[in-house]
Design a protein with these regions (language model features):
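An exposed tryptophan-centered "aromatic clamp" motif
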Residues: 86-107, 113-167
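Cleavable N-terminal signal peptides
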Residues: 16-17, 27-28, 93
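N-terminal secretory signal peptides that target proteins for export/translocation
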Residues: 1-7
Length: 192
């Protein structure tokens, strides 16, 4: 055993020296170079990316209506909440739209959920809802009137419930027909 250690001792010493030189170069050069640590890394200032361009092509018609050119749908500039200052359940929303005259038109209807998607704009983040809550900005163009509802009733309904479009997240939901909280309707018509 002693003979084995005598043979291996020079090899182990060389291995230890190689380890120190390879993995700890500052230790072997410390006396010669008076090792001084580098300055800490300072990252460049953050520059946010430019905003994405909107995919929508909205035109303010100047008569209380807005037209989305691609879909050729005409929308009321004010939704029911901005117009009346209160929320509406599904039944009241249907009646509101049926009796609406805006921009010289009286053929307004309740939109389907997919049609709300034609004015939902994820490049927008406007604090224009009825309570102006900065925690819940609407993905809606500032061409639309201030004081808007957070979500809108659609014409898609059953015996108890109807589909709605939520303009904070862009997700559709199902709500009971008599629900009212922070909701309304934005009337639409075909403009072809």
């Amino acid at each position: 055993m002693i003979q084995f250690l005598k043979i291996r001792a020079p090899f182990l010493s060389a291995l230890l020296l190689a380890f120190v030189v390879i993995f700890c170069p500052g230790v072997t050069n410390a006396e010669r170079n008076h090792y001084v640590p580098r300055d800490p890394y300072v990252a460049p200032p953050y520059v946010p990316p430019p905003p994405l361009p909107s995919r929508l092509n909205l035109i303010d018609n100047g008569d209380g209506t807005i037209t989305e050119k691609k879909s050729k749908l005409m929308w009321t500039k004010k939704d029911s909440f901005a117009d009346l200052g209160r929320c509406l359940n599904w039944y009241d929303s249907k009646s509101y739209v049926e009796n609406l005259t805006t921009g010289g038109h009286n053929d307004w209807r309740m939109p389907e959920v997919w049609e709300y998607g034609e004015i939902y704009d994820n490049t927008e983040s406007n604090v224009m809802a009825m309570d102006h809550d900065p925690e819940n900005p609407l993905a809606l163009s500032s061409l639309f009137a201030d004081g808007a509802a957070y979500w809108y009733w659609s014409s898609e309904h059953g015996k108890c419930c109807a589909r709605t479009a939520y303009f904070v997240t862009g997700l559709p939901f199902v709500r009971t027909l008599d629900k009212c909280s922070k909701g309304g309707v934005r009337a639409v018509r075909n403009n072809s």
